């Protein structure tokens, strides 16, 4: 008698797409690799076209099954996000997974200097506004636009918001 318990299928249909914001950063690349490994196609988004091209090449060299495409997108600009969503709709690409990963991330080489400039008493309002525009407003706008499209066709989807460990662990 055959076992009636089916083996779990850990792969995702190749027709599923995940959009990753801040895709050219370390975490963005790791999210892309993990999703490609299980067969999900990836839409990389970031604000640096050269880094997007390089990240796409690097991921394609790993020979995953999923497709990799990219778009220049500024998460702090609703117009930029709408432009990308419209392009995806034109190409018949539905976003099934949204990973809100974009953030302002100082390079490790400037960490010592960054600690001095990120102390509350020296933190500029300009830097504050930028951090909120990318990390908070960007996640809101992407969730609003892509989440709205997920809800519109009643197929649902996944929205994953990535936060820094500094949200729970003080840097010093």
Task: Give residue ranges: language-model regions.
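Canonical Rossmann dinucleotide-binding motif of NAD(H)/NADP(H)-dependent dehydrogenases/reductases
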Residues: 10-43
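Rossmann-fold scaffold of SDR-type NAD(P)-dependent oxidoreductases
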Residues: 21, 95-112, 135, 161-164
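Conserved glycine-rich Rossmann-like NAD(P)H-binding loop of the short-chain dehydrogenase/reductase
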Residues: 40-54
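The beta1-alpha1 cofactor-binding region of Rossmann-like NAD(H)/NADP(H)-dependent oxidoreductases
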Residues: 49-50, 72-84, 125
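A glycine-rich helix->loop->beta "capping" turn
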Residues: 64-67, 87-100, 106, 124, ...
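Hydrophobic positions on the long internal alpha-helix
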Residues: 84, 99, 142-146
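Catalytic Tyr-X3-Lys loop
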Residues: 104, 116-141, 160
